[in-house]
């Protein structure tokens, strides 16, 4: 059983004091059970520009063994996680996104009793389906939720590595830092999964999910999606065989059909995007749009 843990949460314009308080209560219970157990929670603010968020999160510093570190400049998802690794005091690092909820009272216990050096807990899709029926992020995540239970994730352990909710030994985190060359949004976790695979590092997948119940609006999510396509284009060679979209794009390229993708995007791209950012998005168009958009890069 793990005797010490650093919980590391990168944060940008998100109020996460409630999440930290929940985690601290669970960690303190472990300490009360075993006084040898040591823990800390570090929240690193990656250049937030909302003063109300910063002031609210300052309350984290009042919780035992918790600290809120304010970084004046936004350095990106990879660099802020590497910063947290350097700040951590203990040998096991639990990385969590800031916009999630922990509802399982045994969440921390499930991690500290895991035996592997890399453990991925997974994601549960929360929220009111009636209220979110026209949110494209919710529709996308909900449609793929069952495919990402621990059993299915374990079948492709490295390709299914995600940074939303995972624990890694500090030694491995330092040996395999996140790729800070990734400046756009997305794929830093896919890249790390590939690097772990190259060194035959086992990734254990368990059913210990956090809950995603905070969804950006459709326009914001589509902007992030387009940004992720730029990342995929920039690191296309490195991410081959780790992207379904690249697999299908290569089929078009093999048969010299990529100009067709470009032509379809020029003709229908705005129409499709207007649907996806609108009030009644059609999920079937989402992956089509990604492929078409990628074809223009």
For each feature predicted by the language model, list its residue ranges:
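Conserved donor NDP-sugar-binding/catalytic core segment of glycosyltransferases
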Residues: 105-135
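Non-catalytic, C-terminal membrane-associated alpha-helical segments of glycosyltransferases
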Residues: 227, 246-297
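Glycine-rich, basic loop-to-helix element that forms the pyrophosphate-binding segment
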Residues: 71-88
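Short, flexible, basic/aromatic active-site loop/helix in glycosyltransferases
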Residues: 122, 138-158
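Active-site donor/metal-binding and catalytic loop motifs
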Residues: 199-236
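Acidic donor-binding loop at a coil-to-helix junction in glycosyltransferase catalytic cores
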Residues: 184-192
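Short aromatic/hydrophobic "clamp" motif used to bind/position activated sugar donors
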Residues: 93
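Acidic donor-binding segment of Leloir-type glycosyltransferases
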Residues: 23-70
């Amino acid at each position: 059983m793990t005797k010490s843990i650093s919980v590391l949460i990168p944060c940008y314009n998100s109020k996460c004091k409630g999440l930290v308080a929940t985690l601290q209560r669970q960690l303190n219970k472990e300490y009360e059970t075993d006084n040898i157990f040591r823990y800390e929670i570090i929240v690193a603010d990656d250049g937030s520009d909302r003063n109300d968020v910063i002031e609210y999160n300052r309350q984290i510093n009042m919780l035992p063994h918790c600290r809120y570190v304010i970084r004046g400049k936004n350095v990106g998802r990879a660099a802020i996680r590497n910063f947290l690794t350097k700040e951590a005091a203990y040998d096991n690092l639990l990385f969590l996104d800031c916009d999630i909820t922990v509802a399982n009272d045994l969440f921390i216990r499930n991690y500290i009793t895991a035996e592997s050096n890399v453990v991925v807990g997974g994601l549960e899709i929360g929220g009111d389906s009636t209220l979110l029926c026209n949110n494209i992020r919710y529709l996308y995540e909900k449609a793929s939720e069952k495919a990402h239970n621990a059993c299915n994730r374990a079948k492709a352990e490295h390709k299914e590595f995600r940074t939303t909710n995972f624990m890694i030994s500090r030694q491995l985190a330092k040996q395999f830092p996140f790729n800070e060359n990734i400046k756009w949004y997305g794929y830093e976790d896919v890249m790390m999964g590939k690097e772990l695979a190259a060194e035959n590092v086992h990734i254990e997948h368990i059913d210990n999910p956090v809950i995603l119940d905070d969804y950006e609006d459709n326009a914001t999510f589509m902007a992030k999606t387009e940004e992720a396509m730029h990342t995929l284009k920039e690191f296309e060679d490195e991410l081959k065989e780790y992207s379904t979209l690249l697999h299908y794009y290569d089929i078009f390229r093999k048969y010299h059909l990529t100009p067709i993708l470009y032509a379809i995007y020029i003709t229908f791209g705005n129409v499709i995007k207007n649907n996806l950012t609108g009030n009644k998005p059609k999920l079937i168009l989402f992956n089509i749009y990604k492929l078409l958009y990628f074809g223009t890069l």
